[in-house]
Amino acid sequence: MIRYVIRRLFSTVIVMAVVAFVVFALLYLTPGDPAAIIAGDIATDEDIKRIHAKLGLDEPFLAQFGRWVWALAHGDLGTSIFTNLPVTQLIGQRIEPTVSLTVLTLLVAIAVSVPLGVVAAARAGTWLDRGVMAFSVLGFSVPVFVLAYILILTFAIELDWLPVQGYRSIKDGVWPWLRHLILPSIALGTVYVALITRITRASMLDVLAQDYVRTAQAKGLAPDQVLIGHALKNAAVPIMTIVGIGVALLISGAIVTETVFALPGIGRLTVDAILRRDYPIIQGVTLIFSAVYVLVNLAVDLSYALVDPRIRY
């Protein structure tokens, strides 16, 4: 196990190095000049050149990349071009809404989708199964921003049950915090619920067809005991895999969701940085999101051995 973890951590470092290079190269080649945006419309060429020199944008690509990597190795993600604040500080100010939204969505999605998938597999071919699968197809089909606007029009504007936008810290109370996250979580988590439900159902159907499950049923074990104690436990690995992969859905969906619901999170910060070509923020956020995704999938891989004794590292 230890050797496997060390090997995976080493590969994670390589992946993050490649991601860092690709992100920096893509932003370097992206059309547009942040110096011209900072200088304004009435700036002269000399003003723009002066800003280039100040930001180091007049240096060769490898020199800029090397300087950025050196700062990154010391925990410095750079400084925002427009606010002149450290990127780590800006991300720290915005991290609570994003973490609250993604964690709440993840927990609710797992709590809803796994039972739906199990019930659909146990009642395969019935109206209940067809209803669950129809919901899954619908969940995949509706884009996040479309569902978000439908929820806003229905529950925030027409019924006036929930706030349209904004965020309240959990320090202000659980209910105010939750009220501002219900609609964003539904909009963000619907496609995630649909995905996990389909995978859970397919994995359960495969396990329920195995001989050892039929043997357990023939011994007279209770249906719930067969489903939970035998079938679900052995079907857990594919479900855990899709949960880890789905983190990418949550991260990308959070950017859209935070923009629609005006949540002051990292996703909203990223959109603002893209519109202003604030490259240090874009680079820092991309690296952090990539690291979270890689580490979550590493944790999922390591947890396989906990649910399936046949897996050894």
Where are these regions (language model features)?
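Hydrophobic alpha-helical transmembrane segments of membrane transport/permease proteins
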Residues: 15-66, 159-180
